[in-house]
């Protein structure tokens, strides 16, 4: 799949109504989410390994993104995801998930 195919897939994914709602309420910026998707899934979509400068060119922005800027945004996204996972682990360890306060969120996550 060519660059246009990957970008079309990326744009379609980011415009999904459920993705928009979840992303809006997450700790990831739109740019971080886009960068993370490119890093994790673009090689599968492209059908070949990609270098980071190639991944940087897949961003949807018209401005040229350097490999360094791509990697910096990717690192920020990864740190935010890791912190979110640690937050979930902490709340689980402290028994917060057993509280009824989070029931509606747990129910929603089970329906996804």
Outline where the language-model segments fall.
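N-terminal leader segment of winged-helix/HTH proteins
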Residues: 1-14, 84, 91
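Short, Lys/Arg-enriched N-terminal segment that forms or immediately precedes the first helix
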Residues: 12-26
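Short, solvent-exposed segments of well-ordered alpha helices
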Residues: 22-30, 64, 68, 99
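Short alpha-helical "packing" element that flanks the helix-turn-helix/winged-helix DNA-binding module
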Residues: 31-41
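Helix-turn-helix DNA-binding module
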Residues: 44-66
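C-terminal flanking helix
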Residues: 78-85
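Intrinsically disordered, low-complexity basic tails/linkers immediately adjacent to helix-turn-helix/homeobox/MYB/SANT
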Residues: 86-112
């Amino acid at each position: 799949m060519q660059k246009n195919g990957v970008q079309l897939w990326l744009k379609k994914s980011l415009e999904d109504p459920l993705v928009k709602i979840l992303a809006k309420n997450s700790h990831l910026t739109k740019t971080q989410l886009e960068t993370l998707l490119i890093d994790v899934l673009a090689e599968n979509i492209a059908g070949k390994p990609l270098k980071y400068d190639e991944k940087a060119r897949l961003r949807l922005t018209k401005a040229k993104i350097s490999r360094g800027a791509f990697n910096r945004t990717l690192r920020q996204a990864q740190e935010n995801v890791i912190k979110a996972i640690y937050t979930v682990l902490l709340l689980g360890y402290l028994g917060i998930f057993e509280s009824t306060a989070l029931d509606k969120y747990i129910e929603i996550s089970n329906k996804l």
